[in-house]
C-alpha cells in the first residue's frame, strides 16, 4: 500500500491545474518541489541495519504480489513469506533469529528441494538464514540475503530436536580442513555432493556459493554429469553450509540480477587461483563504502504505516 504512496508525488506533478487560480497553482508547485527535493535528498541516507532488525512482520503488498527491491547486497522485500518450520525433507533451524522469510519463489524452491532430497534418500535438509521479514541489511552474519532470494543450507544433515533447531548456534558441521585448504575426508560424504547437485539443478538457481575446497571436490567427483557445476561458485567461508541464490522473478521490475556465470564448469585455473598466496606488493583493499539503500526501501522504514510491521 505504501508503494503507491511512495510514487504518488511523482504522479502528482502531472495533475491538471488549469482550473486553479495562479496563487493556488504556485503554492502547489512549491509544495511539490519541496517534496521532490526531500525525496531526492533522502536517497543519500544510509539506514542503520538496526532499523531492519526492528521489522518483525512482512511488509504487506498492495496487490498481493511479493516485490524484491534492489540487489542481493543492497535491497529489501515487500510481501515476504515465512518458510514453515518443518516440511517434507527439510527443517528450519535457528528460528530465534527471525530470518526464515523469503520471496515466494524461494519458499517454493526450498520446499521443492526438501522433497527431492527426501526422494533421493538423503537425511533431513537443514535450512538456515533466508532473510528478515522485510529483508534489508543485517547487524551480523551477511552482506547479502537482503531480498529474500538467498538461503543458507547446512552441510550438517539430519533432523534436530525442536530445542536444538530453535537455537542451533555452534552445532554446524565443518567439512573443510582450513589449514590444509581441502575437504576433510573424515566428514565429507556423497550425501553432501548429492544435496548440492540437487540444489543446483533447479532452473531458478543462478548461483550456489561454496568454499573453494568444496568446489574442487565436486569437480573431482562429478563424473560426466557436469551441467550443474557452473552454478557452483567458490567463495570465502562457506565450509559448513552452502548458499543458494535464485534469479530475480520475471515480474519483479525493481529486482537487479547479477551478471550470468561464466561459461564452462568452473573447474579450471580460476578455481585454483583461490589457493595461490597473495602476490608480493599486492595492494591492500580499500574500506568499502556503504551505498544508500534503494529509495523504495527507505520508504518502508519511513512509511506512516510502519507500526504494522515494527516491533
Predicted feature residues:
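Active-site acidic/histidine clusters and adjacent loop/turn architecture
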Residues: 56-128, 188-197, 202-205
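Extended, low-complexity, intrinsically disordered C-terminal regulatory tails
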Residues: 52-63, 109-142, 209-229
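Bacterial N-terminal signal peptides that target proteins for export
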Residues: 25-34
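Catalytic cores and adjacent binding grooves of peptidoglycan-active enzymes
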Residues: 48-51, 167-311
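Acidic/His-rich structured neighborhood in mature extracellular/periplasmic domains
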Residues: 132-185, 244
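N-terminal signal peptide c-region/cleavage motif recognized by signal peptidases
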Residues: 42-44
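Extracellular/periplasmic catalytic domains that process cell-envelope and extracellular macromolecules
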Residues: 118-120, 144-149, 200, 235-238
Amino acid at each position: 500500500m505504501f508503494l503507491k504512496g511512495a510514487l504518488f508525488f511523482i504522479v502528482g506533478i502531472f495533475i491538471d491545474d488549469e482550473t486553479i487560480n495562479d496563487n493556488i497553482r504556485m503554492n502547489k508547485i512549491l509544495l511539490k518541489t519541496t517534496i521532490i527535493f526531500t525525496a531526492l535528498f533522502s536517497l543519500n541516507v544510509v539506514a542503520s541495519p538496526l532499523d531492519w532488525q526492528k521489522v518483525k512482520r512482512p511488509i504487506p503488498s498492495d496487490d498481493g504480489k511479493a516485490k524484491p527491491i534492489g540487489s542481493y547486497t543492497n535491497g529489501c522485500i515487500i510481501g515476504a513469506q515465512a518458510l514453515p518450520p518443518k516440511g517434507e525433507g527439510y527443517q528450519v533451524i535457528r528460528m530465534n533469529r527471525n530470518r526464515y522469510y523469503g520471496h515466494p519463489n524461494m519458499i517454493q524452491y526450498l520446499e521443492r528441494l526438501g522433497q527431492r532430497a527426501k526422494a533421493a534418500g538423503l537425511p533431513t535438509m537443514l535450512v538456515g538464514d533466508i532473510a528478515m521479514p522485510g529483508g534489508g541489511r543485517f547487524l551480523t552474519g551477511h552482506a547479502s540475503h537482503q531480498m529474500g532470494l538467498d538461503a543458507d543450507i547446512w552441510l550438517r544433515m539430519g533432523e534436530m530436536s525442536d530445542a536444538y533447531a530453535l537455537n542451533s548456534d555452534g552445532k554446524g558441521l565443518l567439512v573443510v580442513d582450513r589449514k590444509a585448504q581441502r575437504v576433510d575426508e573424515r566428514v565429507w560424504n556423497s550425501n553432501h555432493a548429492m544435496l548440492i547437485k540437487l540444489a543446483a539443478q533447479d532452473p531458478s538457481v543462478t548461483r550456489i556459493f561454496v568454499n573453494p575446497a568444496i568446489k574442487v571436490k565436486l569437480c573431482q567427483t562429478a563424473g560426466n554429469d557436469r551441467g550443474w557445476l557452473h552454478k557452483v561458485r567458490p567463495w570465502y567461508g562457506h565450509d559448513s553450509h552452502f548458499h543458494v541464490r535464485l534469479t530475480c522473478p520475471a515480474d519483479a521490475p525493481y529486482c537487479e540480477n547479477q551478471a550470468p556465470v561464466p561459461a564452462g564448469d568452473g573447474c579450471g585455473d580460476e578455481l585454483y587461483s583461490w589457493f595461490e598466496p597473495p602476490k608480493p606488493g599486492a595492494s591492500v583493499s580499500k574500506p568499502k563504502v556503504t551505498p544508500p539503500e534503494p529509495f523504495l526501501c527507505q520508504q518502508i522504514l519511513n512509511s506512516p504505516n510502519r507500526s504494522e510491521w515494527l516491533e
